[in-house]
């Protein structure tokens, strides 16, 4: 029974890091004040740019993350949805078909909806697949669903939404333009993520923390333990 409980618990922790595992990154920058994906603080985007001074760093991607109110287009009830904003030309997820979908976010007001989100968000997948125009409000502003992704709910999020940083900042204007919640770093082939993270943690100011992807996954799991 104890082993069954442990297995069940591990399964729950795994659902809390679904997005973390899908991120296309070797290193992840976060604010030292961030506690988990449900409690993220911002840090200066320029810290991410500064990592490019290191030869091992191949490319970076700034990401914003917060909870915004989604309006169910069927019953008009609102519910918090985890919203990620990134530059559509950057690589965000380890998903072959994702970049094609991300391309559609270059037009403002467009979003990708996680079809594994809880049903309380509305029949979004059904409407979208029947080629019905799926338009609703996020944070009181109109958005159009341009595609579906497959991420899945977690401890902290009943549903997920992906959009461009441009649209994100329009939906959440209180977010300073030069501030991000997550910085993704891809290293050149052959680089040692642990070694590079140690170098960056020593060289960057203490308003940012550099984790390997595995450490970022553990950071989230530890919050829920």
Model regions and ranges:
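Structural beta->alpha junctions
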Residues: 33-38, 149-152, 185-192, 203, ...
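Extracytoplasmic
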Residues: 22-24, 46, 78-81, 106-108, ...
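The feature marks short, hydrophobic/small-residue-biased sequence motifs that occur predominantly
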Residues: 45-54, 58, 62-112, 137-139, ...
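Solvent-exposed, non-transmembrane alpha-helical starts
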Residues: 37-42, 73, 77-80, 91-95, ...
């Amino acid at each position: 029974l104890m082993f069954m409980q442990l297995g069940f618990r591990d399964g729950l922790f795994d659902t809390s890091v679904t997005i973390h595992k899908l991120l296309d990154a070797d290193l992840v920058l976060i604010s030292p004040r961030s506690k988990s994906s449900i409690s993220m603080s911002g840090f200066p985007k320029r810290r991410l740019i500064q990592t490019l001074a290191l030869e091992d760093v191949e490319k970076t991607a700034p990401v914003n993350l917060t909870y915004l109110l989604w309006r169910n287009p069927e019953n008009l009830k609102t519910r918090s949805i985890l919203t990620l904003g990134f530059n559509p030309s950057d690589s965000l997820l380890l998903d072959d078909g994702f970049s094609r979908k991300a391309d559609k976010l270059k037009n403002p007001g467009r979003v990708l909806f996680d079809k594994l989100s809880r049903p309380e968000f509305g029949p979004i997948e059904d409407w979208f697949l029947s080629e019905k125009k799926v338009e609703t409000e996020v944070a009181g502003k109109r958005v159009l669903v341009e595609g579906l992704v497959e991420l899945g709910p977690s401890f902290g999020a009943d549903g997920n939404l992906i959009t461009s940083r441009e649209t994100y900042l329009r939906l959440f204007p209180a977010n300073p333009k030069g501030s991000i919640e997550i910085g993704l770093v891809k290293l050149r082939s052959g680089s040692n993520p642990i070694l590079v993270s140690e170098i960056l943690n020593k060289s960057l100011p203490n308003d940012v923390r550099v984790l390997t992807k595995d450490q970022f996954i553990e950071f989230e799991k530890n919050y829920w333990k």
